Amino acid sequence: MSPNPQWDVPRALRVARLFHLVCGVRDACVTPFLTLYLRQLGVAAPLVGILMGTKHLIATCWIPFCAFLAKRYQKRRMFLTGSLLSSAGASLLMVLVPPVDRNLVNHFCNGSSRVATTILPLGVTQTVIMTPTQGSGAPNLPGSRHTRALDTSGFPNGSEGTFSGLQTYLVGSVEGARTTTQGLHLVTSGLRDNSQKGTFEVGNVTLNLLPGSTALGGPVNLSKPQGDTQTPDHSSKGSPWTFILSLGVVVFWELLAAPLEQVADDSLYEYLDFVDATDRNRDLWVWKLLGVSAGVCGIAALVGHLECLLVANGPQGVIYFYSYSLVSTLALAVSTAFPVPIDQQQGPSYKAIKALSLIRGDSRLILLAFTVFWIGATASTVQDFLFWHMKDHGSSELVMGFSVALSLLGEILFHPFRTSLLRKLSRVGVLGLGLGCLALQVLYYAFIWSWWSVLPVQILSTISSGALWWAVGASIEDLAFSGMERSLGTMFRGHFYGSGCSLGSFVGGFVVLHFGIAVLYEACCVVLLLWLALFLSIQPRLPQEQRINYSKLLAMGGSDSSDSEQGSEGDWLVKAMREEHSDWKG
């Protein structure tokens, strides 16, 4: 078959690796920062949860349908090209969504200093206590772009002078801001000058601005950094059109972009399966993670240093979508050489139905499905609101991107120890260890105290994400019938994990609104620990039936060169069955 250029396997693998690398960079441009951008627009936490939950739900239901259509009508190349091209255009629609305050501009791009574009929600009334400071004011937190100490030492004495100085500072520190009925309004019902205590008090200051990380609900000492006062408010009373338009754009965008990965994976798998080389595509996920790691740091650095130069007006973060569109165009060029099998007329496949039937008939798979569901619910809360939490503590986008890259690189570096870890601890042991590390990780997120404090715990992602999914994959391979491993894996990652992500987003937004982000992560920790205890108590009581994977046995038999050995010790079938028994016993 080598003369046929359609089956050039080395070339196909090189193109597939490059495609996964570019797609990883593409996803990293927007996916980690989407909820942070929605916060910049003024969308409240529960609405962000609804939006992200809808996004996950669409992906869960829409991807299998598109994959079926692409295979049934042999239109995979069309799906790949159409998804990349249309999603590149759809991403730019997000730039057109207006913020809650239509007068919002990039106020931090004033040439000399940076001031937050995300500020108080519409109609928030707050009492402000200003304490004089020495020098030019408290310094900014390292890496922070949205906190700034307010220097009141230059304000004149007297009530009228104090209010005038306050108004001049708040308006003047935001270069080019407009003081209109939709912009900044300072309404005072009382002003007191306490010169003996050195404190100026402004009563009932109403700031009609956008939601952000300024502490609400009580007196605030503005001589301190913003993140040190109270829990930020995550509600918004602005126009619902921002949410409605954002929801419409995200739904449309997801319908176009979601099928890409599944259609590409199916195409490559069938291409390699025709020449019995499917085992050679198992390292492609490494290239995807490398792309995400590089992309998330690159886009964060780009936003931090070039956005003021490239985007003068509009909310902070629009460059995410321009970058996504640009990288999608690059991926479109690579996709023209992506391996797609042709003239493979096959009958209808019912592997999804068979996979559901297999799960329903095996209690161990049912338990594993619930485990993956809770993993998805927890992961979505981290994806949706961890960057909010970091932003409230002064983290910049570069620190956020580095935290994501650190966790992904840890998974890649830890992968060579996969086999030894699964052999020493067994699949059940690694699952329990992964759930415990995930619970510890989200509990740590609830108590972060500084802009850098989230970085050390990211090393736990090697276990809470990497090893946990290795154990899930190994369990699926051992519990599935021959030829059903891939269908089961797709169902677990697509349906059960996606459904958990959807539920976590829906519930997480309302928990953040009423209790705060820290309470959300504490609740996730409690749920994971309860499920871990239930999992470890139920697992030993389930029937431990041995299911021989004949494809694995044949692979072992083909590589066994000791057929001439005497006795059962030289029998490859006996060796495989003993290893299978020892794994389940462990």
UniProtKB/Swiss-Prot annotation:
Pfam families: MFS_1_like (PF12832)
Transmembrane segments: 50-70, 78-98, 240-260, 284-304, 318-338, 365-385, 397-417, 428-448, 454-474, 494-514, 519-538
Membrane topology per record: Multi-pass membrane protein
A cellular component term, taken from the record's GO annotations: membrane
Domain of life the protein comes from: Eukaryota
UniProt keyword terms in alphabetical order: Membrane, Transmembrane, Transmembrane helix
Cross-referenced CDD domains: MFS_MFSD6L
Biased composition range(s): Polar residues: 223-237
SUPFAM superfamilies reported in the protein's UniProt record: MFS general substrate transporter
Subcellular location: Membrane
Region feature (Disordered): 218-237
Main location: membrane
Gene3D superfamilies cross-referenced by the UniProt entry: MFS general substrate transporter like domains
Family: Belongs to the major facilitator superfamily. MFSD6 family.
Protein name, per record: Major facilitator superfamily domain-containing protein 6-like
Organism: Mus musculus
